C-alpha cells in the first residue's frame, strides 16, 4: 500500500495546478486521473474548449513554471472584455489601455494548459501521477484516508483533495452538499476564421 501526504483525485487543470503548486513543499503528492493525456500535435486544429486566462492566472502559471510552455504552443492575447446579462441591466466593459496594461489576458485551449501542467508534474520527484486510475472506494480514518482503486490497489493519504469535476464522485461519497440551478441557457461554441484581422 502506497502512502502519501496529499492525494488529489482528478488530474485536470485544477488538480494538476494544485499538485504543481505543492512541488518543493516536502509533501509527497499523488494525482489520480482516469486518462493519460494525449500528446498535442503542433498542426492539430484548435479545440473549442478554451479558458480566458487573466493576468493573475498568468502569474500563477508562471510561478508553476508552465506559462512559457503554454505560450510556445497556442495562446491568443485579448485586449478588451464586455460582460452583460440579457435578463438585467447589468453591463461592464473594460480594456487594457484604460487599465495601463499591454493586454488583459490570453485565450488558451484547455488541452494546452492541461498538457503543460501534466508535463511539469511528470518532471517532479514530489509528484506521483497515477493514470489510468479510478476510485472504487474511500474510507475516512482518524488521521488518514484509505483509497481503493478499481484495479484493487490501495493508497493512504493524510489529505484528500477532490478535483474530479462538477459531478465529483469523491464529493458525493463525502456527502458534501452542492447547490446548483439550471439557467435554461444554451451556448454555441465555434472557431471562426476572418479574412481581415479582428484586433483581438
Functional labels for PLM-detected ranges:
Residues 2-4, 150-159:
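Core beta-strand elements of the Rossmann-like FAD/NAD(P) dinucleotide-binding domain
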Residues 4-31:
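N-terminal Rossmann-like FAD-binding beta1-loop-alpha1 element of flavoenzymes
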Residues 14, 37, 167:
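Conserved Rossmann-like nucleotide-cofactor binding loop
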Residues 23-48:
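Glycine-rich FAD pyrophosphate-binding loop
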Residues 25, 124-125:
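Conserved dinucleotide-binding and phosphotransfer motif residues
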Residues 54-116:
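Active-site-adjacent segment of FAD-dependent monooxygenases/related oxidoreductases
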Residues 131-144:
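A conserved short coil-to-beta-strand element within the FAD-binding core of flavoproteins
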Residues 144-146, 163-200:
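Conserved FAD-binding catalytic core of PHBH/FMO-like flavoproteins
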Amino acid at each position: 500500500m502506497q502512502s502519501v501526504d496529499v492525494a488529489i483525485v482528478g488530474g485536470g487543470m485544477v488538480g494538476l495546478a494544485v499538485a504543481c503548486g505543492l512541488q518543493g513543499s516536502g509533501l509527497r503528492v499523488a494525482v489520480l486521473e482516469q486518462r493519460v493525456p494525449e500528446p498535442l500535435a503542433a498542426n492539430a486544429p484548435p479545440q473549442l474548449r478554451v479558458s480566458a486566462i487573466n493576468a493573475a492566472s498568468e502569474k500563477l502559471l508562471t510561478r508553476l513554471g508552465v506559462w512559457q510552455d503554454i505560450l510556445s504552443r497556442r495562446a491568443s492575447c485579448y485586449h478588451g472584455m464586455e460582460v452583460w446579462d440579457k435578463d438585467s441591466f447589468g453591463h461592464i466593459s473594460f480594456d487594457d489601455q484604460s487599465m495601463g496594461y499591454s493586454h488583459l489576458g490570453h485565450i488558451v485551449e484547455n488541452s494546452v494548459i492541461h498538457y503543460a501542467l501534466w508535463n511539469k508534474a511528470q518532471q517532479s520527484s514530489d509528484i506521483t501521477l497515477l493514470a489510468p486510475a479510478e476510485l472504487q472506494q474511500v474510507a475516512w480514518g482518524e488521521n488518514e484516508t484509505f483509497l481503493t482503486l478499481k484495479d484493487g490497489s490501495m493508497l493512504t493519504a493524510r489529505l484528500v483533495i477532490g478535483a474530479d469535476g462538477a459531478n465529483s464522485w469523491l464529493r458525493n461519497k463525502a456527502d458534501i452538499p452542492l447547490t446548483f440551478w439550471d439557467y435554461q441557457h444554451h451556448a454555441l461554441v465555434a472557431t471562426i476564421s476572418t479574412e481581415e484581422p479582428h484586433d483581438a
